[in-house]
Swiss-Prot record:
Reactions mediated catalytically: a 6-phospho-beta-D-galactoside + H2O = D-galactose 6-phosphate + an alcohol
Active site (catalytic residues): E160 (proton donor), E375 (nucleophile)
InterPro entries per the UniProt record, alphabetical: 6P-beta-galactosidase (IPR005928), Glyco_hydro_1 (IPR001360), Glyco_hydro_1_AS (IPR018120), Glyco_hydro_1_N_CS (IPR033132), Glycoside_hydrolase_SF (IPR017853)
Record-linked Gene3D superfamilies: Glycosidases (3.20.20.80)
Alphabetic keyword roster: Glycosidase, Hydrolase
Family: Belongs to the glycosyl hydrolase 1 family.
GN (gene name): lacG
EC number: 3.2.1.85
Pathway entry: Carbohydrate metabolism; lactose degradation; D-galactose 6-phosphate and beta-D-glucose from lactose 6-phosphate: step 1/1
GO molecular function, one term: 6-phospho-beta-galactosidase activity
The name this protein goes by in its record: 6-phospho-beta-galactosidase
């Protein structure tokens, strides 16, 4: 049976400042930790990325032509405050006003994120969100943006609090490149959630028009053997690290006893302790019912198996299938079902996981209001042929995920839109320029854009709301 989506559904495309803009030092932009980190550790930098800083009119014209009626954009904090605080950079402010005006001219609704992995270097080198002073700096930056950019109707505080803590302090593939420090992971999650809560409360108390929410990456976790209680426990603990801890903070305003039991177990085994203060929970509790929406970024699911060895994580950054490894002491190890389809980067393709995650939010956090799927897409080594890409694999991936969104809506979940990652090809944080996701192919040498086969398919779905 052919499935459909609601008439008012947003068919969006997603971007992020650092991954798309380029112009990393242009017009007074301050440095971010990634600038030097990429130079020192990787085979690529964020120059020129997709040159969105100069070419946004082209991308927004294409968006309008191809039925894309929403775009996720992030503001580069260091374009507004080059050192994260203090003096404002007027050229950065002007750039975003121009960008949002172009969005509205093209009838593409901007969903604007305040922080997408790019804390200004001056604050990042001072502890980033492990330093509680950063909570104040973020709230001040948020307040400036709420006041200044009144043309924005949809605000997101953070993109992917989970993967920030994970990338910075567990896997160690994000600056500062620390590995296996679970206490820092949870502390980073917690302090960022307090920052989110404070910003949301300020937004509502000040009476700004528009809506505000947060974007969480929520990879669904399953036991490798559902009949083995140890595997079930491994999946529960892994879910706490990546999903439940931040969801509890968002919608319960505290951490449930079950969540804290899991956190305490993980820290007992791995060492470290958390600094959770009474005023933090006052802030979390005050914001728990104020979120207008939840953004869910979903690409994959994981299967967890009981494991009692030492922690070892190997990140597959070059698309060499089968080269990744993930096992955490006292938690478990990832073990894919034998027949699970995977990308070249070892991400397990499992659309049902998105359905399960949406329904989990609906069941466990009934105060959620509404959901946007703020990122979903297929990273691929695209072959550019005849000025296009015949990306049938991407079409199939997106189609199957849109179908389960349709199912979730039929089953009572309030899902209002979908943003494909990514609108045009952008650079990938820990994989460079080879891993492409876009609807529009970018020739990074010339910065020309070419619609892929998926763009024509997506246009038809957006026009008809019929998934076929």
């Amino acid at each position: 049976m052919t499935k459909t989506l609601p008439k008012d559904f947003i068919f969006g495309g997603a971007t992020a400042a650092y991954q798309a803009e380029g112009a990393t030092h242009t017009d007074g932009k301050g440095p971010v930790a990634w600038d030097k980190y990429l130079e020192d550790n990787y085979w690529y930098t964020a120059e020129p990325a997709s040159d969105f800083y100069n070419r946004y009119p082209v991308d927004l014209k294409l968006s309008e032509e191809f039925g894309v009626n929403g775009i996720r954009i992030s503001i580069a904090w260091s374009r507004i405050f080059p050192t994260g605080k203090g003096e404002v950079n007027p050229k950065g402010v002007e750039y975003y006003h121009n960008l949002f005006a172009e969005c509205h001219k093209r009838h593409v609704e901007p969903f604007v994120t305040l922080h997408h992995f790019d804390t200004p270097e001056a604050l990042h080198s001072d502890g980033d969100f492990l330093n509680r002073e950063n909570i104040e700096h973020f709230v001040n930056y948020a307040e400036f943006c709420f006041k200044e950019f009144s043309e924005v109707n949809y605000w997101t505080t953070f993109n992917e609090i989970g993967p920030i803590g994970d990338g910075q302090y567990l896997v160690g593939k994000f600056p500062p490149g620390i590995q296996y420090d679970l206490a820092k992971v949870f502390q980073s999650h917690h302090n960022m959630m307090v920052s989110h809560a404070r910003a949301v409360k300020l937004f509502k108390d000040s009476g700004y028009s528009g809506e505000i929410g947060v974007v969480h990456a929520l990879p669904t976790k399953y036991p490798f053997d559902a009949n083995n209680p140890d595997d079930v426990r491994a999946a529960e603990l892994e879910d706490i690290i990546h999903n439940k801890f931040i969801l509890d903070a968002t919608y319960l305003g505290k951490y449930s006893d079950k969540t804290m039991e899991g956190v305490n177990h993980i820290l007992e085994v791995n060492g470290g302790e958390l600094d959770l203060r009474e005023e933090d929970f006052v802030a979390l509790d005050a914001a728990k019912d104020l979120n207008d929406f939840l953004g869910i970024n979903y690409y994959m699911s994981d299967w967890m198996q009981a494991f009692d060895g030492e922690t070892e994580i190997i990140h597959n950054g070059k698309g060499e299938k089968g080269s990744s490894k993930y096992q955490i002491k006292g938690v478990g190890r990832r073990k894919a079902p034998v027949d699970a389809p995977k990308t070249d980067w070892d991400w397990i393709i499992f659309p049902q996981g998105l359905y399960d995650q949406i329904m989990r939010v609906k069941a466990d956090y009934p105060n959620y209001k509404k959901i946007y799927i703020t990122e979903n897409g297929l990273g691929y080594k695209d072959e550019f042929v005849d000025k296009t890409v015949y990306d049938d694999g991407r079409i199939d991936y997106v189609k199957k995920h849109l179908e389960v969104i349709s199912d979730a809506i039929s089953d009572g979940a309030n899902v209002k839109g979908y943003f494909m990652w990514s609108l045009m090809d952008v650079f990938s944080w820990s994989n460079g320029y080879e891993k492409r996701y876009g609807l529009f192919y970018v020739d990074f040498e010339t910065q020309e854009r070419y619609p892929k086969k998926s763009a024509y398919w997506y246009k038809k779905v957006a026009e008809t709301q019929v998934i076929e």
